[in-house]
Structures are given as C-alpha cells and as structure tokens.
Amino acid sequence: MIKTEGQGLWELLKISLPFFVLSTCYAVLVLYLEEKFGDHIFLKSSQIGSVFGLAVAFFLGFRMNSAYDRWWEARKIFGQLTNNARSFSTKIYTYVLSPNKLVLVQEEEAKKAARDLIDLTCIYISQFKSEISDNLNAKKDEETERLFKDYSIDQNNKLSNEILISLATKIEALFAPKATIEKSDLMQHINQFYDIQGKAERIKNTPFLKIYSAFTKATVILYVLMIPFIIGDIDIGGEESYLEYLSIPLFALVSTLFLTINRLANLHGDPLAANKTSVPVDQICQRIIGNCQELKAKILS
C-alpha cells in the first residue's frame, strides 16, 4: 500500500512515464508529417477538439469518482471487519471466563473453549482473506486441522461459512440458558461477519461496468490521437525560430494527463486486486489475527 506522498509520486511516475514517452514519439511523428505534407493536415477549427476534450474530461471524472467510491467502500468493509473481530474476541475473553455464565464447570475447560473460539476466529479471518484473494489452496497447519476435526468442519463446503457455523454452534452449546444477553451479543457478531463477507464478495464478484470502461478507454485513446492535429504546430517567431517544437512537450503532457487518469481509475476500480493502489487486505488481516492472538495469550497466562 502507498503510505507516503513520496511513494505515491514514484508510483505515479512509473505509471505515467511510458505514456509520456509514447505520446512524445507520436507527437514527433505528426510534426514530421506536417513538415513533409504541410499545415493542411491540422484541424483548422479548435472548437471540435474543445468540445471533444470537455466530453472526455466528464467521462474520466465520473470514472475516477466511481472507482474511488468502490475503493473507499472496500476500505470501510475491512475496517468493519477489524472492529468486529476485535470486539468479538474481547467478548469471548470476557464472557467465557465468567463461570456463572457457562455450562462448563471446570476452569480449564472454559479456557480451552475460549482458546478454540479465538483460534477459529483467526482461522476465519485467514480463510476470508484467502477466498477474497482466490487463494483457495492455502496450506493449513496442524492446529487448524485439529480444530477442523474437533468441530466437524466439512472442508468440501465453503470453509468460511463452515467456520462461522461452528462458532455459532459452539456459542449456543457453551452458555447456560440464563446467559441470553451474552449469547445474543456474540451471535450478533456472527451475523456481522456474514454481512461483511457478503459485502466484500459483492465488490469482488461485481466488477466496474466493463462496457463503460472500454468505452472510456477508447474515447480517451481517440482523443489523444486527435490532440496533435488539434494543437497543431507553434509558429511564433517564424519557421526558423524552432518554437513549433513546443507543441511536442505540450501534446505529451496533455496526453499523459488523460491516459494516466484513465489508468488510475482502472486500478482503483478493482480495490481487492493485488496491486499497490488496492486495499491492503493481507496487512489488515494479519493485524486482526495478531490482536486476537494477544487475547489468547492472556488466557494462557
């Protein structure tokens, strides 16, 4: 994830530099054609270019705004996941270690149940990350395999759902009938996990309208190809002043601007992809798991 302006500038340069080089080469080619065939290859009226450029700017503005909305929604979803997982683990630590709330009598049994619930929460977070990243064949350690066996988790089904079912079943069996408030509170967190997962899967499985993206890209490319014919050459001071060559960097800058904005919109429009502009899913999930493991360490101490 890009965290500083310096990193952002470096990534921006890596994206825009190829566009600038290609635009410069294209401008040189057009200027060469003008020198060979004359000024009649340029458009005599700039009105067409102005109207077309305004339309392209509107398209790109809407595209960038929509892409950022998707990115921000994804970031809020993972912020909600962080808060829900931390709160859920904290309440497990608090509720399960209250003997009068549980069916279990032995303190060691209660601690083991709390550890298992926190471990299952960590496994759920890891599995949720794997499913969002399409990494369905992630390796499982011995502790995970043990929990899957102890809680009869069917690995042939969707694992994230199976883990939540096991969590809900364990909570239902763990608390005494009089602990309805605690049980209901924890079940609400299970429901929130389902809600968060559904929102994330909606973003992942519903990409930004590809037809609109293709149309915007084609429009931008067409406009970029037209720009040198709209700008023309700059004949201030006469043909021998060489000021006409100012049209080359001018065209390259304008073209790079439009092409870079379109590229940034495409990157931000897929917020769960593995690139530097996407939501840092791995970092967020590792932080959540670390926080949950801290609570587990309190139980062991």
Enumerate the language-model features and the residues they cover.
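Structured inter-helical modules in multipass membrane proteins
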Residues: 91, 95-212
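Transmembrane alpha-helical segments and their cytosolic interface motifs
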Residues: 14-20, 189, 201-232
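Amphipathic, membrane-active segments
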Residues: 79-95
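N-terminal juxtamembrane/topogenic regions of multi-pass membrane proteins
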Residues: 1-80, 98-102, 237-243, 259-267, ...
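Hydrophobic alpha-helical cores of multi-pass transmembrane domains in eukaryotic membrane proteins
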Residues: 25, 55, 193, 219-226
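Selective transmembrane helix interface/packing segments
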Residues: 156-159, 214, 225-238, 243-252, ...
